[in-house]
């Protein structure tokens, strides 16, 4: 769809890639057949992934965010994603160029192709048509606005409080890993009841700590207008922002401009 996928097409063309328009009813079947007959040839929609990963490169760009920082930001973005039984969103972080979009929403090529074929009654896998649409919310870990959001989240949580909960999680994780290492060579019936109780206790404690941190991060995310704006811009680029959500986006945009 040249209109709905315009931003993805434009970015691909700016990189010097040729983009084929394949919107016929049989095109899904044709490209699958063509790929099977030509080893090493692969087709992908322009919105199947971020432009840096549509065609894999040997050189990898460095990620500005640490794994811990990504874990902090994931619930923040999750909090403002659409809640719909027909759509599933998964937040991932990629080391894109800082001048690229801060948030991009993509849809897995395989799942998209299977659902399209299922809709036509082909592919031999009709159950794909009953599955929710699955999207990746790709957050650009090198974008200045993402760094700004991280700073706001850390300040909003409180440096000492965040450090404290992270330390508790790290300690509980270490304790659980140590116990699992101790028990790894034992069969379940060989594990003493006290050890089983300890394992359950550690697992429950770690789960509660993570839920506590996630709940606080989601609260901060829901109140962050910049997060909502970036997600809505990505949804808008993918043609998925409509109705009430579109109206809220317009109102928020006006408020942010007035400031």
What label would you give each PLM region?
Residues 1-259:
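Long, intrinsically disordered, charge-dense linkers/tails
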């Amino acid at each position: 769809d040249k209109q709905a996928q315009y931003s993805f097409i434009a970015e691909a063309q700016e990189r010097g890639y040729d983009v084929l328009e394949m919107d016929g009813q049989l095109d899904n079947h044709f490209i699958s057949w063509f790929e099977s007959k030509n080893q090493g040839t692969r087709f992908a929609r322009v919105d199947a992934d971020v432009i840096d990963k549509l065609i894999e490169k040997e050189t990898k760009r460095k990620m500005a965010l640490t794994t811990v920082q990504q874990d902090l930001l994931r619930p923040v973005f999750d909090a403002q994603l659409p809640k719909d039984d027909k759509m599933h969103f998964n937040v991932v972080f990629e080391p894109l160029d800082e001048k690229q979009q801060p948030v991009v929403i993509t849809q897995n090529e395989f799942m998209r192709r299977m659902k399209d074929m299922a809709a036509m009654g082909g592919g031999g896998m009709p159950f794909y048509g009953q599955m929710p649409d699955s999207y990746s919310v790709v957050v650009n870990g090198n974008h200045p606005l993402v760094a700004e959001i991280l700073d706001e989240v850390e300040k909003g949580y409180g440096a000492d409080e965040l450090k404290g909960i992270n330390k508790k999680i790290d300690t509980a994780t270490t304790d659980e890993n140590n116990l699992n290492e101790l028990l790894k060579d034992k069969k379940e019936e060989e594990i003493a009841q006290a050890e089983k109780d300890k394992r359950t206790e550690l697992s429950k404690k770690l789960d509660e700590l993570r839920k506590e941190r996630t709940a606080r991060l989601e609260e901060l995310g829901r109140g962050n207008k910049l997060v909502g704006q970036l997600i809505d811009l990505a949804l808008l680029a993918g043609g998925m922002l409509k109705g009430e959500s579109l109206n809220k986006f317009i109102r928020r945009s006006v408020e942010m401009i007035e400031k």
